[in-house]
Structure formats: structure tokens, C-alpha cells
Design a protein with these regions (language model features):
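Enriched for short, Lys/Arg-rich terminal
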Residues: 1-5, 15-23, 54, 62-85
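Basic, amphipathic "hinge/linker" alpha-helix immediately C-terminal to the N-terminal HTH DNA-binding motif
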Residues: 6-10
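Flexible interhelical turns and helix-capping residues at alpha-helix boundaries
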Residues: 14, 18, 33-36
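A short, surface-exposed loop/turn module that caps and links secondary-structure elements
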Residues: 28-52, 82
Length: 85
């Protein structure tokens, strides 16, 4: 199992969401404790970043296999997420 860490801006963004969207995103983030058990995609042009799609939202994260840490760097709507990297 990996430890999941959330960036400050992720926490701030999640606080602004409605409860239904927040639950869906937290559910996806919890699954990152075992990051390679579910389908994942790499972010194009960024060899160290991965993404998960949750409806209109994207979760952008990095996996440190050596230290067993998943760092969630960004959660945002698709149209804004990739511009903020």
C-alpha cells in the first residue's frame, strides 16, 4: 500500500466543490493507495505524472515507487487542469 498525500491547492479546491463531486473524487483518490491496480494514463509530455478521469474532473498525481508515496498535485475541471501544470 502507498501513502497518499494531497497538495494544499487540492485540499482548497475540494472544499469548494459540492458534496456529490467531492465524494466521487475522494473515492478515486482513496483507490490510489494501490495506484497500479486500476487503469491509469500518463500525462502527455510529462513522464512522471499520471491522470485519472472522474467525470469532468481530472486528478493529476505522481507516484514515488521507492518511498511508496502517491502525491496528488492537482484536481480541476478538464479544460483547466492541463493548463495549470
Amino acid at each position: 500500500m502507498f501513502k497518499v498525500k494531497l497538495h494544499k491547492r487540492v485540499i482548497k479546491f475540494l472544499q469548494k466543490l459540492n458534496e456529490n463531486d467531492r465524494k466521487r473524487i475522494f473515492s478515486a483518490i482513496e483507490k490510489l493507495e494501490d495506484p497500479f491496480s486500476q487503469p491509469y494514463e500518463k500525462v502527455k509530455g510529462r513522464k512522471d505524472l499520471y491522470k485519472i478521469r472522474v467525470g469532468d474532473y481530472r486528478i493529476i498525481y505522481r507516484v514515488d515507487k521507492e518511498d511508496k508515496i502517491v502525491s496528488v498535485h492537482l484536481v480541476d475541471k478538464r479544460e483547466r487542469a492541463y493548463n495549470r501544470l
